[in-house]
Design a protein with these regions (language model features):
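Short acidic, glycine/serine/threonine-rich loops at helix termini
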Residues: 75-79, 111-114, 180, 202, ...
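Extended active-site and interfacial segments that coordinate phosphate-rich ligands
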Residues: 11-15, 36, 113-120, 124, ...
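Conserved catalytic cysteine-centered active-site region
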Residues: 87-89, 221-229, 255-266, 273
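Phosphate/diphosphate-binding loops
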Residues: 103, 259-303, 516-531
Length: 700
C-alpha cells in the first residue's frame, strides 16, 4: 500500500501538544543567556546625531549598549536591510539604531527606553499613490518575472468591444497587510570564541538561506554558520529570508562571544522588522465580443516599495496565463517610499492580482448577462497563453463544475440584491484560482540504512507548521518502498544536506524530488537488502520533460455572504474550495492547508488592513486588537476538496504545490458574493459595513 495519499496524523503533533517541541527562543546554550532588545528610531527619515547611553548602561543587569559608534563592524554593507548599527542614516521609523544586552528580557527592554537619541530629521514620504513623482518600472518583479508583457494590440480590441461587445475598465486596491504567525520571529545565537563559528536557533523558513545570506555580511564562510530550526510556528513567507533581527542577534553574539544571545521580536515589532504585503493598485481592462469571449486582457499594477530595498509584487503576472485572449498586456510599476522593505506574504502577487482580475471577470459576466462560471469556462485556454506550451494538467473547468454541484450554485440569485432571509440579504460568489508549480533546484537528501529494515533520511528542509515532517516521511517511504514506520526523518539543520526555502508552494516538490533521487541511487547501489551503514546522497535532478509543459495548480472558490439590511454587517456562513494540485501526499494536512489559505482570503476580503500614520511614518495597528484577523465566529463553515489526479510531468511523486492556492481568489469570491447579495460593487479591500450603507434598502 502506498504511503503517499494516506491520511496521517502529524508525527510532530505529540511533541507540540505536550510542550516538548523546542522553538527558537527556548533553546539553551553555553552559560547563562543574554537577552537583547533593540533601540529603534522615532523618525522616518534623517540621521542620528548622538546617542546618550549612560543611564541605560547604569541599570542593574545591563551588560552592554551597542550603537553605530561601538557595534562590531560588518564585512559587507551592500544590502541595506542588513546595515544595522553601521552608520547613522535613518530610512524608516522603527529602524534598529542600537541594541541593549542584559541578563533579563525585562532589563533589556527597560534600558532601551532610557537611551537618549538626537536626530537631524528630514521630510519623509510614506504616501502611496499611482501618480507618485518617483514611480518607476522595475527591472524585475518578485519571482524573477519580467515586469511587462505584450501580445497583439490592445487598443483596437478595446475600441471594437465598445461598440460590438463589452468592456470592463476598473481599478482595484489592496492595503498593506502584515504577517502574524503564531510564533513571532525569534533567534537564539552564540558565537564560538574559538571559532569563528556562529550557531543560530532561528525561526526561519530557510535554514540554509539564512546561513548563505548572513555569511558575507558577517565576513564568514557559509559553513561557519550553523542554523537550526526543528520547529517553526508559522511564517507565511515572512520567515523566508533573514531580516534585521537576525543581524541584531549576530552583532550581540559577536560582542559577547561564548554567551547565548536571545531575542524574540515583539508583536508590535512584527509590523516593522520582517516584511509585509505592500499596497497595490491594479487597473484591469477586459474586452469581449457580444457572447463574452475575451478579445483583450490588460493588467497594469502599482506596488508600494521601499527606499531600503526594492520589492515589487508580481500582481499582474497571473493575468498572463489565466484566460485566453489574442491581445494581452501586463505592466508593473514600483512606488518607493520611506517605509520598511516589503516581503513575502502568502501568495505574494497572486493574492492581490487574483482579487482584481476575478472581480473584473465577475463584472464582465454581469455586463454580458452570463453566469460567472460559464464566462470562465468559455475563456478557458487549451494551451498556456503566455508560452504556448501545453498544460501538464489544467482542470479548472472540472473544479468549477464540481464546486457548483457541491455548493448548490444553481440556487444563486440571478439578480443582485434579490434574495432575503429575514433581515439578511443573501448572495453567492465564485472566483478561479491559479498558482504556478515550482521545483527549486539544488535540494539534496541523504539516505542511510540503519539495519532491521529501518532507514534514516536527512534533508535540510523545515516544517513551519504545514505538516512537512509527516509528508516527507510518507514520500521517503514510497521512494524506498517501505512502510512509513521504517523511516526516521531529520530536518531543520544546516548540518544536514542542502535544502531550498519553504516558500512558493515548492517545499514538498523540491525536497521530495531530492529524496526520490537519493532513494533511486541508494537502491541501485545497495539493492533491497542493504547493509547497516550503507549511505547515499543525491540532489534533485533536472526535469527536462516538465520544460515541455506549463505546470500550474488550479482551483475554484465559492462563497455565500449575508449582509444585514439594517446595519451592513457582513457574514460569510459558507466557503468551498475545489482544487487541482496533482497527487495529494497527506490528505489530512493538505486539507488544513487549503482551509487555512481560504481563511486568509476571508481575512483579506473583510478584515486585514495595516493603517500607516502619514505624519510620523509608522503603522498604528500594531497589535491583534487593532489589526483584525478572523476568529472562529467569522470562519464558521469552510470546506475544501480536491480532484483525484496525478501530474506525471510535475514531480516524481505526481504532486504540484498546495500551500498558497487557498488564498488566491478566495477574497474575490467573497467580494463577488457581496455584490450578488447587495448590488454593491466594491473594488477596494477590506470591505467594511460603511462601504455598503448607501446600497442597503431604504424601505424595511
Amino acid at each position: 500500500m502506498s504511503a503517499i495519499g494516506t491520511s496521517t496524523p502529524r508525527l510532530d503533533g505529540p511533541a507540540k501538544v505536550t510542550g516538548t517541541a523546542q522553538y527558537a527562543f527556548e533553546h539553551t546554550g553555553p552559560g547563562e543567556p543574554v537577552f537583547l532588545h533593540p533601540v529603534t528610531s522615532t523618525i522616518a527619515r534623517g540621521s542620528v546625531t548622538s546617542m546618550d547611553t549612560s543611564e541605560a548602561e547604569s541599570q542593574p543587569g545591563v551588560l552592554a549598549v551597542l550603537t553605530p559608534w561601538n557595534a562590531p563592524r560588518l564585512a559587507d554593507t551592500s544590502e541595506r536591510e542588513y546595515v544595522i548599527c553601521q552608520d547613522t542614516d535613518v530610512l524608516y521609523r522603527g529602524q534598529p539604531i542600537g541594541l541593549v544586552l542584559a541578563e533579563t528580557a525585562e532589563a533589556a527592554r527597560w534600558a532601551q527606553s532610557l537611551v537618549r537619541v538626537e536626530y537631524d530629521q528630514q521630510p519623509h514620504d510614506v504616501g502611496f499613490r499611482t501618480d507618485h513623482p518617483d514611480v518607476y518600472e522595475p527591472e524585475v518583479v518578485n519571482g524573477g518575472y519580467e515586469p511587462a508583457s505584450s501580445t497583439g494590440e490592445m487598443g483596437p480590441s478595446l475600441a471594437r468591444a465598445q461598440t460590438h461587445g463589452h468592456v470592463v475598465d476598473q481599478s482595484y486596491s489592496t492595503p498593506e497587510e502584515h504577517n502574524n504567525p503564531m510564533e513571532p520571529h525569534a533567534v537564539s545565537a552564540h558565537w564560538d570564541p574559538d571559532g569563528p563559528l556562529l550557531t543560530m536557533y532561528d525561526s526561519t523558513q530557510s535554514p540554509h538561506g539564512v546561513a548563505s545570506t548572513l555569511a558575507p555580511v558577517l565576513g564568514l564562510e557559509t559553513e561557519q554558520i550553523r542554523v537550526i530550526a526543528p520547529h517553526v510556528g508559522g511564517g507565511f513567507g515572512s520567515k523566508g529570508a533573514p531580516h534585521a533581527h537576525d543581524v541584531l542577534v549576530a552583532l550581540g553574539a559577536m560582542h559577547l562571544p561564548g554567551r547565548l544571545i536571545k531575542y524574540a521580536v515583539t508583536r508590535q515589532q512584527m509590523f516593522v522588522f520582517v516584511g509585509y504585503r505592500p499596497r497595490t493598485v491594479s487597473r484591469i481592462r477586459l474586452a469581449s465580443d457580444a457572447d463574452g469571449r475575451l478579445t483583450a486582457i490588460g493588467h497594469e499594477a502599482w506596488s508600494q516599495s521601499s527606499r531600503v530595498k526594492e520589492f515589487v509584487e508580481q500582481a499582474a503576472v497571473p493575468s498572463r496565463s489565466m484566460y485566453a485572449a489574442p491581445n494581452r498586456r501586463t505592466f508593473h510599476h514600483a512606488v518607493p517610499l520611506d517605509v520598511p522593505a516589503p516581503y513575502w506574504m502568502r501568495a505574494p502577487g497572486e493574492a492581490p492580482g487574483a482579487f482584481a482580475a476575478e472581480v473584473a471577470m465577475d463584472e464582465l459576466a454581469e455586463a454580458c448577462g452570463l453566469d460567472p462560471i460559464e464566462l470562465r469556462v468559455s475563456n478557458d485556454p487549451e494551451t498556456d497563453p503566455e508560452s504556448g506550451r501545453p498544460w501538464s494538467s489544467r482542470r479548472l473547468v472540472d473544479c468549477l463544475r464540481e464546486g457548483a454541484d457541491r455548493f448548490g450554485w444553481s440556487e444563486r440569485p440571478a439578480t443582485p440584491a434579490s434574495r432575503r432571509d429575514g433581515r439578511w440579504m443573501v448572495g453567492y460568489g465564485v472566483a478561479s484560482a491559479a498558482y504556478p508549480h515550482m521545483v527549486q533546484s539544488g535540494s539534496q537528501a541523504t539516505i542511510r540504512a540503519e539495519g532491521g529494515g529501518r532507514y534514516r533520511v536527512q534533508v535540510g528542509a523545515v516544517d513551519i507548521g504545514t505538516g512537512t515532517w509527516t509528508a516527507l516521511t510518507l514520500v521517503a517511504a514510497d521512494a524506498l518502498g517501505v512502510p512509513a514506520e521504517a523511516i526516521s526523518l531529520e530536518i531543520g539543520d544546516t548540518a544536514l544536506p542542502y535544502a531550498t526555502v519553504a516558500g512558493g508552494s515548492s517545499g514538498i516538490s523540491s525536497w521530495g524530488s531530492a529524496i526520490f533521487a537519493a532513494a533511486g541511487r541508494f537502491r541501485t547501489r545497495y539493492g533491497d537488502d542493504p547493509p547497516a551503514g550503507a549511505e547515499t546522497t543525491a540532489a534533485a535532478g533536472d526535469n527536462p520533460e516538465l520544460e515541455r509543459y506549463r505546470a500550474i495548480s488550479f482551483g475554484a472558490h465559492f462563497a455565500e455572504v449575508r449582509v444585514d439590511a439594517d446595519t451592513g454587517e457582513i457574514r460569510v456562513p459558507r466557503m468551498l474550495g475545489v482544487f487541482s494540485i496533482g497527487r495529494v501526499v497527506n490528505p489530512r494536512t493538505v486539507r488544513s492547508q487549503f482551509i487555512g489559505g481560504m481563511t486568509f482570503g476571508l481575512s483579506m476580503a473583510l478584515h486585514e488592513q495595516s493603517v500607516r500614520d502619514t505624519r510620523f511614518g509608522h503603522v498604528v495597528t500594531q497589535n491583534l486588537a487593532d489589526y483584525h484577523v478572523p476568529t472562529h465566529a467569522d470562519a464558521t463553515d469552510i470546506d475544501a476538496v480536491w480532484l483525484d489526479e496525478v501530474d506525471e510531468f510535475a514531480t516524481p511523486m505526481g504532486t504540484r504545490g498546495a500551500g498558497e492556492i487557498g488564498n488566491v481568489g478566495s477574497a474575490a469570491a467573497v467580494v463577488n458574493a457581496i455584490h450578488n447579495a447587495t448590488g454593491a460593487r466594491i473594488r477596494d479591500l477590506p470591505v467594511h459595513a460603511d462601504a455598503l450603507l448607501e446600497h442597503l434598502p431604504v424601505d424595511q
